[in-house]
Amino acid sequence: MKKENYSFKQACAVVGGQSAMARLLGVSPPSVNQWIKGVRQLPAERCPAIERATRGEVLCEELRPDIDWSYLRRSACCSQNMSVKQLNDSNKSSFDHT
C-alpha cells in the first residue's frame, strides 16, 4: 500500500505547486508527483533543500520521520564548529610571524 506524503504535498503548496518544487530541486514534475503519492520514497538528501525552500515551514523531520535528523543536525553543527575552529587556527598561524 502506497502512503501519501502529506508533508511534502504541503511543502509543494508553500513554494507554489509541484512544478515550482520540481524546478527548485532540479527534478522532473513526475518525480515530485511520485514522491507525493508514495510511488517512490522522497530521497532523504532532498529534505534539507525542501526545508530551506519552505523557510522552515516544513521540516526534514516531517518529510522523512524515519531518519534521525536530530543526530544529523548535531553532527553538522559539530562539523561546522570544527571548520570554523580550523579556519581560525589557520588564520592565527598565517598572521603569527614572530
Curated annotation (Swiss-Prot):
Gene3D superfamilies: lambda repressor-like DNA-binding domains. The keyword Aminoacyl-tRNA synthetase does not apply. Induction: Not expressed under normal physiological conditions. Expression is repressed by the transcriptional repressor RacR. It comes from the Bacteria. Disruption phenotype: The toxic effects of racR silencing can be observed in the ydaS deletion mutant (where YdaT levels are elevated), but the ydaS-ydaT double deletion mutant shows complete attenuation of the toxic effects of racR silencing. It holds the Pfam family YdaS_toxin. Keywords: Transcription, Transcription regulation. GO terms for molecular function: DNA binding. When overexpressed, it induces Rac prophage excision, possibly to counteract the lethal toxicity of YdaT. Overexpression of ydaS or ydaST reduces growth and leads to loss of cell viability. May contribute to toxicity and morphological defects. Encoded in the Rac prophage region. The ydaST locus was predicted to encode a toxin/antitoxin (TA) pair in a genome-wide prediction of TA pairs, however it was shown in subsequent studies that it does not form a toxin/antitoxin pair. Whether or not the YdaST-RacR module forms a toxin-repressor combination or an atypical toxin-antitoxin system, or whether they are actually essential regulatory components of the prophage genome, has been debated. This is Putative transcriptional regulator YdaS. The gene is ydaS.
